[in-house]
């Protein structure tokens, strides 16, 4: 093997891999964690049932940070009629990298009549991080979705800018008989013009939605005082918010969730206990 081939092999072997696969099923009117497999440090705590039938699960990433060459995969499958709410106790941190790109791939399959609430903490990209983030949601007929994603470039609370590094973020939401959402955001360190100079971007997606639901969220966005907007893509409601303050942005997302959960799911808000800590 040549020196160049050895270096390439070392780069490919850099970092570690982790994979978490969860399958939710409905049994006797209650959603259960029917099966789960994991490799590496991606784990889940035991399910919680603070509101009866829906299953609340916390996804854990014990090391707390993602570095050069790390590869994480999250694969979530909801069987017909099941309802799962997933969140995380902490942010996903992508640290400075001088090696291969760190990669996080998340796949969610919602079978007919199932419901997913994906409400993670933010993904923080330290200055110098090189990261790839890919999230794909596939909805079958009758499935319902409430999902948000928050990208934090740099550490605003520490006055640290994302001066160098790179982020490649993909978001796909596939709906039956509709176009859905297929987008890609590429950012280079020091060039946040696409975000109007804001270090924080949140995207909140809800389905199925209609014009009445859109009108419910617009007053909340109008009073924020920072750039925000909402639009309907068929039956998919897409909300985007820019901010300079992570805590303020998290409160905004939770307020939107308190509005959208009754509107989309017909259920009162039942915040995960971890939000109160």
From Swiss-Prot:
InterPro entries linked to this entry: UreD
Protein's cellular compartments: Cytoplasm
Keyword Ion transport: no
Entry's Gene Ontology cellular component terms: cytoplasm
Protein function: Required for maturation of urease via the functional incorporation of the urease nickel metallocenter.
Entry similarity comment: Belongs to the UreD family.
Protein name (database record): Urease accessory protein UreD
Source species taxonomy: Bacteria, Pseudomonadati, Pseudomonadota, Gammaproteobacteria, Pseudomonadales
